[in-house]
Amino acid sequence: MTVTRNGCRIFPKLHYEVHGLVADKCYSMVFHIAAQFKEPKFICHPAGIKMGALWTSRTISFEDFFITTNPQPTDNSMIHLPPHCKFTPILDVYEVVLDHMQQPATMHRVSSCRLPYTFMTVTMYKNREARVLKLGMNPHARHFLKNNTNKNHLDTASLIPPIPSVQPLPLFPLPQNSMSYTFSYDTYPSNIHVAPIQLPFPFPAVLSTLASSLQLCRDGDPEEIDEEIDIMN
């Protein structure tokens, strides 16, 4: 996945469905990235604390967050990841207990969803077919294709998965002292299930295309070959 100093949206889009929550209990969705050599930055869903009935009735989206090479991002929606860094998005579901003032007192993690893939940040795609394929599947990056259509032609329409529509949740931000919660990590209830709606790519077709491209450059520059291997992660 490409990363710049100005920030790139995380792709594939982070859309989730949650099942098995208790309808009248409060929950919060917390997202972070597990990355090499980096302490995770935890980001609460902007909808804040909601009842289980609401979370299970809507699509949960974390698509409005960005990764950046800037080590000191000023925007809370930015997550710093250096180039050539392996990472995996993770969504945790916390049950929230409110005090007598209806303020959060404790948070207890009840479920977690880790994508079954490891990604790697790169500053560019050197292989033409891989570049057009990846950009063609990312709606946030398709404007790059307009300047490269003639010299980087590749039909990717059949490989682009449908992007589900998302019904936004009403905003209810967490209080400023939300980071003072007490977190616990006991065994998850077996009835709660979190799953991504859209898997990253139709991987068999994509990997087959990338493997063919890699075979053509095996005798090329070693650094370029390394870069192409990064794309597959």
Curated annotation (Swiss-Prot):
Residues 1-146 bind DNA. One of its GO terms (cellular component) is nucleus. It comes from the Eukaryota. It is found in: Nucleus. InterPro entries: p53-like_TF_DNA-bd_sf, T-box_DNA-bd, T-box_sf. Transmembrane segments: none annotated. Keywords: DNA-binding, Nucleus, Transcription, Transcription regulation. One of its GO terms (biological process) is cell fate specification. Pfam families: T-box. Its main location: nucleus. GO terms for molecular function: DNA-binding transcription factor activity, RNA polymerase II-specific; RNA polymerase II cis-regulatory region sequence-specific DNA binding. This is Putative T-box protein 41. It comes from Caenorhabditis elegans. The gene is tbx-41.
